[in-house]
UniProtKB/Swiss-Prot annotation:
NCBIfam families: PRK05751.1-3, secB
Known function: One of the proteins required for the normal export of preproteins out of the cell cytoplasm. It is a molecular chaperone that binds to a subset of precursor proteins, maintaining them in a translocation-competent state. It also specifically binds to its receptor SecA.
Natural source organism: Rhizobium leguminosarum bv. trifolii (strain WSM2304)
Keywords (A to Z) from UniProt: Chaperone, Cytoplasm, Protein transport, Translocation, Transport
Subunit relationships: Homotetramer, a dimer of dimers. One homotetramer interacts with 1 SecA dimer.
Protein name: Protein-export protein SecB
InterPro entries attached to this UniProt entry: SecB, SecB-like_sf
Highest taxon, organism lineage: Bacteria
PANTHER family tied to this protein: PROTEIN-EXPORT PROTEIN SECB (PTHR36918:SF1), PTHR36918
GO cellular component, one term: cytoplasm
Amino acid sequence: MADDNNTNGAASPTLSILAQYTKDLSFENPGAPRSLQARDKAPTININVNVNANPLSDTDFDVVLSLNAEAKDGDKTVFHTELAYGGVFRVAGFPQEHMLPVLFIECPRMLFPFARQIIADVTRNGGFPPLMIDPIDFTQMFAQRVAEEQARAKVEAVPN
């Protein structure tokens, strides 16, 4: 007996990238040229990550991965960079309960290597060593987002 993964003639799920683009890119080096001089210790780097998804049609979605990195030496900003990197994805054939994980885990996972390279290039071009952002656990980020939304819904559901 052969395995049949195509139940009831339904199309198998597909996820494809139709386009990728830089939506917004900013790099600030407010202390240049002093910030480029050798320093005793490496600056502290804080990185914030966000993912947004918006429908364009029944099957096409715009997913934007936002990376914000700031390097500080004490209270002085050494550099600050922001990137909004987007992709237009065609998502078809997935059960409804899998749509949010696909949009908020798989799509940003596909965008991340390109966004990481842009951040590395812009920091290098700004006169610093390239900032190589560690891989991001989008599954954990999505789980945290869902937990926060559920907690917020509970608080809003409690009568005053």
